[in-house]
Amino acid sequence: MDYLQAMRLREANRLMIAKFKKESPANDSPEQRLVRLTNENPQYNVDFLFHSYSKDWFVSDVGMKMSNVMIPNQMLALDCEMVLCEDGTEGVVRVGAVDRNLKVILDEFVKPHKPVVDYRTAITGVTAEDVQKATLSLVDIQEKLRPFLSAGAILIDHPIVIDTSLVFKYPNSRKLRRPSLNTLCMSVLGYEVQKAGVSHHCVHDAAAAMKLALAVIKKRVDTTITLTKEAEKSRLFLHRIPHHLSSEELKKDLALKFFPKNFTIDVKPAKTQGGYYCAVVIFGSSVEANQAFENVNGYKETDSSGLPQKLISCSISTFYVR
């Protein structure tokens, strides 16, 4: 596909989406309502305002074929495992997809086209050996998915077109915070999809996103979610952790600093090379979490939301806990 053709397709798709936004919400199908909830969220453009066209992009021709805005019910949930590449960008190394019936239609490793510096195995479950055995490129994956998207199917993930992190929300007092996929699964579906200390699986995460969308479509569950007070208060959030402090070193430091010592850590990797990362420390109860926060040595202050936090020092750096 050449540049001009891609731009024509993109413009046709843009016009189709613009027409959809002008349509009355009263005419929406349940599936379209979720798309609208995603598109109308104030944070949507923050995540989805991309460049007009990039070399490796696949641009569909849906807008060229459809004279009227579609009323689709075909949905596809997708999830990817990402690694950190040598140039500081992220690369896709595994893709999983399920259909509306939760049937697995894709679960493949992807051969990255850039050198990898961090496989994030503890998070992704992907090893260097897995990637070395991969034979499919990202273009191959696009071609495998293309038949499932050709009829204007809706893409679901945390986060993609139906972005479950934008569909579901916390109460107004916490409107800038987005619920994690695990939080949504515990609150809406009643189970953990990502257990602390256990690596992710893209097929399981894709299936969880599909189940969340179906819960709204079929069961009409409330999209305003809250953690139980006990579950919310049993966690401490660590942020602005420097990249040179490895997750293993972090765990060793916390084992020395935190009391009680019976806790698990869920690390969220940095998006860019050299960037800060964050982590959630999960205790058995709110009492234990409060004890750990009060017992740890650090400079006490408040964050931008007015929540108490501490700047604590470790063997080679500092970070915040709240």
Swiss-Prot record:
Disruption phenotype: Plants do not show a phenotype alteration due to the redundancy with other SDN ribonucleases. It is found in: Nucleus. InterPro entries: Exonuclease_RNaseT/DNA_pol3, REXO1/3/4-like, RNaseH-like_sf, RNaseH_sf. Its main location: nucleus. Keywords: Exonuclease, Hydrolase, Nuclease, Nucleus. Its EC number is 3.1.-.-. Signal peptide: none annotated. Residues 75-213 form the Exonuclease domain. One of its GO terms (molecular function) is nucleic acid binding. PANTHER family: RNA EXONUCLEASE REXO1 / RECO3 FAMILY MEMBER-RELATED (PTHR12801), SMALL RNA DEGRADING NUCLEASE 1-RELATED (PTHR12801:SF145). This is Putative small RNA degrading nuclease 4. It comes from Arabidopsis thaliana. The lineage of its organism: Eukaryota, Viridiplantae, Streptophyta, Embryophyta, Tracheophyta. The gene is SDN4.
